[in-house]
Amino acid sequence: MEICRGLRSHLITLLLFLFHSETICRPSGRKSSKMQAFRIWDVNQKTFYLRNNQLVAGYLQGPNVNLEEKIDVVPIEPHALFLGIHGGKMCLSCVKSGDETRLQLEAVNITDLSENRKQDKRFAFIRSDSGPTTSFESAACPGWFLCTAMEADQPVSLTNMPDEGVMVTKFYFQEDE
């Protein structure tokens, strides 16, 4: 009888420890607005860089590899995020003007954006992973995807024809170390 009571006591202690640890280790459900830097390059190996204040995709070699722009990311939902460059001081946005939809860089601090403000929706992108690649759809302009041209040194833009093969909409997206 004494052995059973001792085992039961140890078992209860073990269970309390396990459940207590699980509660402490589990995320609280609050989203993190912490900015993280990522490397991005398209499936044709073109990386992003800035040329005349415009985001461009091309093949950087030699000393030019230092021109590569890291993408600053602030997650806002499980698959939605804000994208920026230059330490989050310039943000990518989807702007619709008449029939034209275009990608532009805006001088906005990425950490000042909020998923709850309607005017900030133009900065939000939906991330979709497919195997090793990722695509980014505009939250403000559904059906419009971040893309690069087939040719090098062309502006990063948006397309509403992701499967036509004219523009590249699949990217490798890796947290920068």
UniProtKB/Swiss-Prot annotation:
InterPro entries: IL-1_CS, IL-1_fam, IL-1RA/IL-36, IL1/FGF. GO terms for cellular component: centrosome; cytosol; extracellular exosome; extracellular space; nucleoplasm; plasma membrane. Disulfide bonds join C91-C141. Residues 1-25 form the signal peptide. One of its GO terms (molecular function) is interleukin-1 receptor binding. It comes from the Eukaryota. SMART domains: IL1 (SM00125). Pfam families: IL1. This is Interleukin-1 receptor antagonist protein. The lineage of its organism: Eukaryota, Metazoa, Chordata, Craniata, Vertebrata. The gene is IL1RN.
